[in-house]
Amino acid sequence: VRDLCDKMGILVIDELFDVWQCSKEGVNNESFNEWHERDVVNLCHRDRNHPCVIAWSSGNEVPEQGMKNLHHISQTLTDLFHREDPTRKVTSGCNNANAARNGFGDTLDVYGYNYKPWAYKDFAKDRPHQPFYGAETASCVSSRGEYFFPVDWNKGKGFYLYQVSSYDLYAPGWANRPDVEFAAQEDNPNSAGEYVWTGFDYIGEPTPYNLDATNALNVPEGPEREKLMAELKKLGDRAPSRSSYFGIVDLCGFKKDRFYIYQAHWRPDLKMAHILPHWNWPERKGQVTPVHVYTSGDEAELFLNGKSQGVRKKGTGEKDRYRLVWEDVKYTPGTLKVVAKKDGKIWATDTVTTTGKPAALTLKPDRNEIKGDGYDLSYVTVAVRDAQG
């Protein structure tokens, strides 16, 4: 993996532990005391010659963040990393809101925030000497191609029948939609950037359709944590959900809508526009069906069957800073087209069209030849086409 990251220019923070001495929801590392030094040595010696590795991480969301009598463990790990590789800094993923102030942050070279965009401003003011970044951000949840109505901007809504609406507005209690993290990063340039949870969906951790007590670690002890645990208990363990909804890309490698809000924000020079949702809603004729557009442009005009639905410009609010929204579009079969502009000039377009009845299947392999060794693979994308293709 690191060889690929070297070639592709992907920046890696090489993380060693998820648990130190203290157990995390019943899972512990009984061999930590005996093996932690050897583990640090082995990791450093294996990876220190990879240019993609920009820092070492000693842990992620460890309970010791909140235990002053155990902060020495973090300092020990930092010292070991420095001994084996004096060229790189050491960080840790911190989800304890107090860890930056209770002394734990002093044991790290670089502070990693998990899901605390609201804390960036004060951190930069209180600790100007210490670099920081978003070690885990967003945790927005969605299912590719699923949209539920009415569209509610409350991040705790949008869940139905083991799916999550793909308007990219929804997240667990500790998490946020991408727009919130984007704003925090831009408004606090002291932050080095963000690592999003997650790039791809994965098997397990099907939040919000599971009782995962580790979620409670993302909020402080007290009423807030008690409220979250009550919400999780109410949701329960709702099989058949078995994989995550966090990914920007789904389990098959297909891009979700959310891919395009990141593309628009991270690649401002790329001419792009993306419309959501799809435009096949026979049961919604005449009903309000909001349209969202992600674009690297700064304004756009939306057309439905050639009729303008109005111009939207990016602003400074949460609803219009990173997406353009037409709240009152009434569904009519046909074609949606968006024309995005930048600096007053046409920048990019996108269209979605109501499809007809299925007429054919097309198969597109990602390669036409594979080795006959029983191991090589070709992934085939199957598309259902109407008579117009």
Predicted regions span which residues?
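Short, solvent-exposed loop/linker segments at the N-terminal edge
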Residues: W281-G286, E369-S378
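Edge beta-strands of extracellular beta-sandwich domains
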Residues: G344-G356
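Beta-strand-rich structural segments
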Residues: V291-T295, Y375-G389
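Extended substrate-binding grooves/exosites of carbohydrate-active enzymes
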Residues: V1-I346
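Generic structural detector for well-ordered beta-strands
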Residues: V325-K330, T351-T353, K364
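A general secondary-structure signal for short beta-strands and their flanking turns/coil
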Residues: V288, P333, P358, Y375-L377
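Low-complexity, acidic Ser/Thr/Pro/Gly-rich terminal tails and inter-domain linkers that flank the onset
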Residues: T355-D373
